[in-house]
């Protein structure tokens, strides 16, 4: 009996061991398979990671590019806005006829004002040139007559060496320009001047009367006469030049 019991126990142990081996065998096989396939899986994962990383970076860069640049809808809207702005600007440049007429009238007015100013300036320059350089100007006649008075011996004997001339004297004592008179006789121009002289001799003063006549041959103006009236005592007249006899 004991022997049979021991044999039964041994048989059950064998059965238990065989069942355990059977249960462990698939696990071991799976483990080996996993160990065999792990490098390939790891390589596959690395390859996938390596291949996926650029895709992710490209995706990110694509996203950043699209976010930085305008969207197609916004580009269309901006283009339509620019076109509308250009059209409005072109439409705004069109000037109505009334505005053109106003601008033309204003330009014509400015032109008239400019021409008027030029004419006035030209007249002033002509007057100044005539007064300073023309032989028929009163200032020129006055200067020539004064030089003849300064060089005349009788005038020097009465008034002294330094003889000076001046025009009319106002109530305030200011000396004005030389008085003159112009007229035309027998088609020839005549100019008469009147001024005053005084010299180094105290209390001596004289009045000068001079007249010029246009010479038809040369166009110059020649003296007809130059007189000096001494106003102090004794009164007398100094004849510096008298050409009136040549008129006959």
Swiss-Prot record:
Membrane topology reported for the UniProt record: Single-pass membrane protein
Annotated TM spans: 108-128
Source species, domain of life: Eukaryota
Transit peptide: 1-18
Compartments where found: Mitochondrion membrane
Annotated Gene Ontology cellular component terms: mitochondrial inner membrane; mitochondrial intermembrane space; mitochondrion; TIM23 mitochondrial import inner membrane translocase complex
Gene Ontology BP annotations: intracellular protein transport; mitochondrial cytochrome c oxidase assembly; mitochondrial respiratory chain complex I assembly; protein import into mitochondrial matrix
Record keywords, A-Z: Membrane, Mitochondrion, Protein transport, Transit peptide, Translocation, Transmembrane, Transmembrane helix, Transport
Region feature (Disordered): 67-98
Family: Belongs to the TIM21 family.
Quaternary structure annotation from Swiss-Prot or TrEMBL: Component of the TIM23 complex. Component of the MITRAC (mitochondrial translation regulation assembly intermediate of cytochrome c oxidase complex) complex, the core components of this complex being COA3/MITRAC12 and COX14. Interacts with COA3 and MT-CO1/COX1.
Alphabetical list of PANTHER family matching this protein: MITOCHONDRIAL IMPORT INNER MEMBRANE TRANSLOCASE SUBUNIT TIM21
Functional description taken from the UniProt entry: Participates in the translocation of transit peptide-containing proteins across the mitochondrial inner membrane. Also required for assembly of mitochondrial respiratory chain complex I and complex IV as component of the MITRAC (mitochondrial translation regulation assembly intermediate of cytochrome c oxidase complex) complex. Probably shuttles between the presequence translocase and respiratory-chain assembly intermediates in a process that promotes incorporation of early nuclear-encoded subunits into these complexes.
Name of the protein in its database record: Mitochondrial import inner membrane translocase subunit Tim21
Gene name of the encoded protein: TIMM21
